[in-house]
């Protein structure tokens, strides 16, 4: 799984949890109503959107920082593991090719 897929899933999980909290919905609705009263020309959903963005921004920033910290700790070992796996795969492929070539030359295993 790619890191971007994990990041998107994590952000969607956070948004789902925050939206499912009743106090969050009530707070956003109250701020939306306050904005609508202050400016009768404003769309109600626009006020709710701005209040939601204002509310969720610190959590998103914290989540991004956490993901960056975790990714920075995992990238170096992952690169080393990938390099090791590539070397092993290369060795195995060379051995298999050598065995196949020997079988073709000798006519197969007649043990």
Swiss-Prot record:
GO cellular component: extracellular region
Subcellular location: Secreted
Keywords recorded for this protein, A-Z: Antimicrobial, Secreted, Signal
Propeptide: 21-44
Tissue specificity annotation: Expressed by the venom gland.
Signal peptide range in chain numbering: 1-20
Family: Belongs to the formicidae venom precursor-01 superfamily.
The protein's role, per its UniProt record: May have antimicrobial properties, like most ant linear peptides.
Protein name, entry field: U-myrmeciitoxin(01)-Mg8b
Annotated source species: Myrmecia gulosa
Classification of source organism: Eukaryota, Metazoa, Ecdysozoa, Arthropoda, Hexapoda
